[in-house]
Amino acid sequence: MAIFLLKKSYQLNNLKEIKFNDLWGGHGVFTTMWIFDKSFKILFFKDHINNLIKSAKAYGINTKNLKKNIFKLLRKNLSNSKKYNHLLRIALNKKVISISLRSKIKIKNNLVLKLVKLKRQKPEYKNLKYKEILLHLSKLDTSKFDIGLISNKKLLETGTSNILLVKDKKIYSPIKGFYKGITFRTLEKKLPKIHKKNIYVNQLHEFDEIILVGSGKGVVSVSKIYENSWKRKSLNYYNLISKVLSSEIKKCKKISI
């Protein structure tokens, strides 16, 4: 169960506070960022906000001064005196902007992936059509489990993260049909070449490692797949990718907004 520190909603046209609405299931977009430390830092903040603005325009949310207003609400709701280790979510539709902060869950070392036949709607954008994914996740202890989204017998991503797989000392990711998150995009530039490949469920046994990458989880190694024979054979590339992300975290500066 997520523990929320903050849940606020505002009318987009005048920033007047209204009753909180998480906006799930509606026509709109969102982003989730990791906020941490005192005098808060937000990992990949600029990229998250720019991508949110770009996605909002694609969804017809063309509010004047949108970025400026987002910053105004963040200044109002975040404190330099508080030590954070939370996930900051900003969601938008044409009328409402919602901001929430929930505690970042500590992921167990032996994460299990549970495969479900499900595909994100319009995966090129981080949109709010997310209720089916949330329903599946609500039935699990998300510190120990995640769901692997399967479409046409191919593994695309998880309910929370992008997915990387390792075979013969090469890193692979699905070709298409998934949302490419900000953490994934950043690490993709820093890692050895990532080969694009359709990841069929019946070929998972060929891979030595399955690694999840996302804002909420960071970098996590999957230990096994529920009701599947696949089990982790190595941690080599998990360790490599973790070091790359740790380097990015160390470079993260206090946010000035």
Regions inferred by a protein language model and the residue ranges of each:
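Helix-start/capping segments and mature chain N-termini
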Residues: 1-76, 93-257
